[in-house]
């Protein structure tokens, strides 16, 4: 009889919080083990290794394998978290934890890998185009993924005969394409501050503030210092300029999401993720998002058939790290101290 497979430690590490869970990567759905997720403030620990040690001690299980998704640049053996001073070295962290295998991946690689294990209960359809699921082992698919939060993450996932290949990009830094006279004026205003204006300057938390500030300047109003949540709260209370801001955000989001499909050839669907999507889901559903998504000239009829899905799974980063562990199980990356 074969011994049960040891779980893999998966982590989703951001600038504020570190989330950990145990996963069974052999499970094609729901690979995260029940009640294993814990969240800690990164400021409480001097290093990622010590945060992971704390988790393993707290949960009372030891493992020798890990996949850590990092919200920042991963360069070979080293990763740096955006907006936090941790510098993570893979070999040093693995040695500290007694791991045989440790992978560091970008957080949006994990978000993309999560697509392969999401179920109907984990997504909400935006528009009428339906998402058709197929057994992973037989699937050949191209998906896009886009996620506004502190910045704008963009990536993709190719599936070939059950094997997943995440596409890591910097698509959030593509130049912003205005589609209306009002958006052209907004671009002119933001250009005065930033010079070149990327999509991330509008489709992100700070982007909400930028759009609102530009609209205020057009209206000859000084809005004072505002945070993204201030603007979304004002929109919920019926403030006209804040409502215009959120509507514009959703419309522009639709345009650049459609552009992503065309650029990547993501003909099987695009997934919306990131911290802002659940908060703005109702606005996205009732805005011009889908109309702008489909409005691609000679490709409009094709775009109308492509599903767009908002991810509502609470921990897609952990889910994707587990999926990454599944696909790397046959080709382990050994750690040598």
From Swiss-Prot:
Pfam families (alphabetical): Glucokinase
Domain of life: Bacteria
Keywords from the named record: ATP-binding, Cytoplasm, Glycolysis, Kinase, Nucleotide-binding, Transferase
Reactions accelerated catalytically: D-glucose + ATP = D-glucose 6-phosphate + ADP + H(+)
Main location: cytoplasm
Top-level enzyme category: transferase
Biological processes annotated in GO: glycolytic process
GO CC, alphabetical: cytosol
Annotated binding of ATP, by residue: 11-16
Location of this chain's protein in the cell: Cytoplasm
UniProt xrefs under Gene3D superfamilies: 3.30.420.40, 3.40.367.20
GO molecular function: ATP binding; D-glucose binding; glucokinase activity
Enzyme Commission (EC) number: 2.7.1.2
Assigned protein family: Belongs to the bacterial glucokinase family.
Protein's name according to its UniProt entry: Glucokinase
Lineage of origin: Bacteria, Pseudomonadati, Pseudomonadota, Gammaproteobacteria, Lysobacterales
């Amino acid at each position: 009889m074969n011994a049960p497979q040891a779980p893999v430690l998966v982590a989703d590490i951001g600038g504020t919080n570190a989330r950990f869970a145990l996963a069974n990567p052999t499970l094609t759905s729901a690979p995260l083990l029940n009640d294993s997720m814990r969240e800690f403030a990164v400021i409480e620990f001097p290093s990622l290794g010590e945060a992971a040690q704390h988790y393993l001690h707290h949960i009372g299980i030891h493992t020798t394998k890990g996949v850590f998704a990092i919200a920042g640049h991963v360069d070979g053996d080293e990763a740096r978290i955006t907006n936090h001073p941790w510098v993570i070295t893979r070999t040093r962290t693995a040695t500290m934890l007694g791991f045989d295998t440790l992978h560091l991946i970008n957080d949006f690689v994990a978000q993309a890998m999560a697509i392969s294990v999401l179920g109907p209960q984990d997504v909400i359809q935006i528009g009428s185009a339906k998402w058709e699921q197929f057994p992973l082992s037989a699937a050949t698919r191209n998906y896009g993924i886009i996620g506004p939060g502190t910045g704008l993450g963009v990536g993709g996932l190719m599936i070939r005969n059950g094997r997943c290949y995440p596409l890591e990009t910097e698509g959030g830094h593509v130049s912003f394409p205005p589609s209306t006279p009002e958006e052209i004026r907004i671009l002119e205003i933001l250009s005065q501050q930033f010079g070149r204006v990327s999509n991330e300057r509008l489709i992100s938390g700070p982007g909400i503030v930028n759009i609102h500030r530009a609209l205020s300047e057009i209206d000859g109003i000084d809005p004072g210092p505002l945070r993204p949540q201030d603007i979304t709260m004002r929109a919920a209370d019926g403030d006209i300029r804040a409502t215009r801001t959120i509507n514009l955000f959703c419309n522009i989001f639709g345009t650049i999401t459609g552009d992503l499909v065309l650029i990547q050839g993501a003909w099987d669907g695009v997934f919306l993720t990131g911290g802002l999507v659940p908060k703005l889901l109702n606005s996205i559903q009732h805005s011009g998002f889908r109309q702008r998504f489909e409005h691609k000239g000679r490709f409009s009829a094709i775009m109308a058939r492509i599903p767009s899905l908002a991810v509502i799974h609470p921990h897609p980063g952990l889910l994707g790290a587990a999926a990454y562990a599944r696909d790397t199980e046959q080709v382990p990356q050994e750690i040598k101290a």
